[in-house]
From Swiss-Prot:
Homodimer. This is Pyridoxine/pyridoxamine 5'-phosphate oxidase. Belongs to the pyridoxamine 5'-phosphate oxidase family. It comes from Zymomonas mobilis subsp. mobilis (strain ATCC 31821 / ZM4 / CP4). Binds 1 FMN per subunit. It comes from the Bacteria. GO terms for molecular function: FMN binding; pyridoxamine phosphate oxidase activity. It is an enzyme of class 1 (oxidoreductase). The gene is pdxH. Keywords: Flavoprotein, FMN, Oxidoreductase, Pyridoxine biosynthesis. Catalyzes the oxidation of either pyridoxine 5'-phosphate (PNP) or pyridoxamine 5'-phosphate (PMP) into pyridoxal 5'-phosphate (PLP). The keyword Acyltransferase does not apply. FMN binds at residues 41-46, 56-57, 62-63, 85, 120-121, 165, 175.
Amino acid sequence: MTQDPHKMFDEWMDEAKKAETDDPTAMALATASKQAFPCVRMMLLKGHTKDGFVFFTNLGSRKGHELLENPVATLLFHWKKLRRQVRIEGAATLISDEEADAYFATRARKSQLGAWASEQSRPLPARDVFEKRIADIEARYEGKDVPRPPYWTGFRVSPIRMEFWNDREFRLHERELFTLNDGRWQSEFLYP
């Protein structure tokens, strides 16, 4: 039995990248408001190390507000073809500006422009308003590199719990839970 859930995650992700044709890095991100109302949405994992799991967003979005007010999150990866899922719980912290800048520079130009144009999660009166904003920003940065907006950054979820779930016949699933205690991972199996 492995005692390193990060290594196990990497192994499962490698298998998912071979088996899943559509976004094996897709994950559900659950946050909660200060009033404890949960909200979940799909995101893409953009990095994983022993320090945590990184994704990027607009701080003005609902998830941005919730993570700043209540900096905890749960991630869920579901790989249907492999009949597996991984659930990760932990503290969410902002990444460094340098890390956010480096990732932003790798994004497609249209995605960079969209980050400037979108007032994410705010009401949009009509689609053409958004398209005009994109065109205006595209004109502003014509022939120039697009810098990262100050409100666009990443979060790192540093896990304290990681559960690995394997589907089994007759709903006799296999669940292994890793819990971080005093800097060491402990594992146990759970009833399905």
